[in-house]
Amino acid sequence: MADLAKIVEDLSSLTVLEAAELAKLLEEKWGVSAAAAVAVAAGPAAGAGAAAVEEQTEFTVVLASAGDKKIEVIKEVRAITGLGLKEAKDLVEGAPKPVKEGATKDEAEKLKAQLEKAGAKVELK
């Protein structure tokens, strides 16, 4: 273990030019390429970054609260979901609850506007 600590200490004291020369020597000795290893290591990270930048395509419309006009919100939830009166009432009273999952952006915005017009507070996730 002391030998490894000494190697780490020696490597830490190298200049950038010396480290580059060491990398070349090791590539030749072991028959590998450091550039390929860096590309493989960076590949998944670059893919994750691209996924985070992509625009969300599916949304969940969540009823945060019914607000003051609970009856109007229940009517709107029934119209949107096709639920019966009792099920729609339970959904509204149990807020926050999802009203619609897997909606497109346009559909989610439309549903949000309908519910907010009825007096509900709505979130898109």
Swiss-Prot record:
Belongs to the bacterial ribosomal protein bL12 family. The keyword Ribosomal protein applies. Homodimer. Part of the ribosomal stalk of the 50S ribosomal subunit. Forms a multimeric L10(L12)X complex, where L10 forms an elongated spine to which 2 to 4 L12 dimers bind in a sequential fashion. Binds GTP-bound translation factors. Pfam families: Ribosomal_L12, Ribosomal_L12_N. It comes from the Bacteria. It comes from Methylorubrum extorquens (strain PA1) (Methylobacterium extorquens). This is Large ribosomal subunit protein bL12. The keyword DNA damage does not apply. One of its GO terms (cellular component) is cytosolic large ribosomal subunit. Forms part of the ribosomal stalk which helps the ribosome interact with GTP-bound translation factors. Is thus essential for accurate translation. One of its GO terms (biological process) is translation. Keywords: Ribonucleoprotein, Ribosomal protein. GO terms for molecular function: mRNA binding; structural constituent of ribosome.
